[in-house]
Every structure is written in structure tokens, then in C-alpha cells.
């Protein structure tokens, strides 16, 4: 798998040398149709009806969304599909879907296909789109562990958002604003990478700690060997998601991937510019003689 990923990481992506081997995507939202994969409960995702949040994890089974017992994994009951337009204003199931892990992990070439297949039918301001990237060479990971990466990616996304004519009240702008209350709570523009790389399991109560995972970029090396971008919102509206919303989400992920490769290219150019050639002196040999009397 890694041999193929390494070969793929030498391709061009949007005209830039691609150094990303594998891609992971997390999509949060609400579903009224079976996405064909497990819908995992996520406490940060909220829709404004008390019975919309599932009490247990969910997954798909024979084309139906089902509740699953947390301990046994057995089906508890199927979730009915809304029969009327009024009922469809609220999702049947809420939470997140997570892309496959190795050896079936996504790449820069097929992540969009997966996103189009499983994207939720409803999203709101509580829903996030997280992007994980990994590398065939650990040196590229270490090059990203710097406070400079977050402002670089934020600016790249801001340029993209302006080019897309994204409305001023869209949640993208809130998440790109380091002073927005939601951003400070869920994707703070802080660099905690030196401590995050050591965390071996997901901590939901880590806010305020030196290793909090709730930052714009989370360096979850010890858990997943990935860099996680947590600053994107989901694209769409509570009343429904359109095909263009999904395509805009795909383009947002593409912007994050391209920004990663751009940053790595800049780092490599800087390293070459700062390299110093050292000319070794020829060896000096001295002979010492002794006279014994």
C-alpha cells in the first residue's frame, strides 16, 4: 500500500508536486437516506429538535439506517425514513461519517467520489468537515509542525472563499476568524503541535490544556499518523443540501490539500536556500620524533 502511496505522492496536484500519500475525511451532518456506511454519534452536532439526536451509534443495514447497541453491536431498531416533506425538515440520523482507513484509505485522486456518495442531506452551523493527510516520508510531516502553517492555510482558504463569492454570513468566515466564539471553542487558531503529537488517544475534555485537540490544525501523529485540519465547516443549509453545495465542499478540501503541498514546497525551497556548503580542509599530518639517550 505504501509503495503505491509513495508513487502517487510524486504526482502533480493542481500543478504542484503532491507529497500527500493518503487522505481522510470526516463529514458531520444529518441524514434521511442511508449513506452506505456507519453514522457515528458526535456530541457537537445539534439539530433543533430534542428527538433528533440518536441515543446510540448508527450504521447502515440493507439500505436502512439502524440503531445499534453500543456493547454488542446488534441492531436495536430501524430508523424510519420521513414520509412527508414536513418530517423531512429534520434528519433521521445525525452525527458523522468517516472515510475508510488503510488499506482502503482515500487518496488525493478519489476522495471526491467518496464525498459525493455519503454527503449528508442536511447541515447547519454545528457541523464540521475535517481533513486528515498523511505522508510516505516522515520528514514531510515534521516540516508541517510549525506555527506558520495555520495562518498560511487560513489565508489560502480566505482567498478561495473570496473567489467562490461565499456570503459574508457563511460559517466559513467565522471559522477563519480567530476571535469568533465558535472558533475559540472548536478550532482555535493556536499552535500546540509539539504536545499534540504525543497524545495517544482522543480526549474530548482537552480544551484549555497544552495538548488540546480543538485547534484549527491538530497533529494527531501518535493516534493516526496524520495532520488533521479542523477549520472547515460543512457546506449547505439546514433546509437541504444541493449538488452545488457538495461540489463546493469538494473544492474546499482540494484547497486544503493544495495549501499543504504549497507549504511543503516553500519549506523545501527555503531549506535549499539556507543550506551551507562546507569545504573540508585537507588532513594535517604531524610526525613526532623522540631521541632515547
Where are these regions (language model features)?
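Terminal catalytic/cofactor-binding subdomain
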Residues: 1-119, 235-237, 247-267, 271-276, ...
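Histidine-centered divalent-metal-coordination microenvironment in nucleic-acid enzymes
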Residues: 28, 122-139, 226-230
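Inter-helical turn/loop segments and adjacent helix faces that build the functional surface
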Residues: 138-141, 240
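Aromatic/basic-lined ligand-recognition segments
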Residues: 141-235
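Flexible helix-coil linker/hinge segments at domain or subdomain boundaries
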Residues: 159-181, 258-292
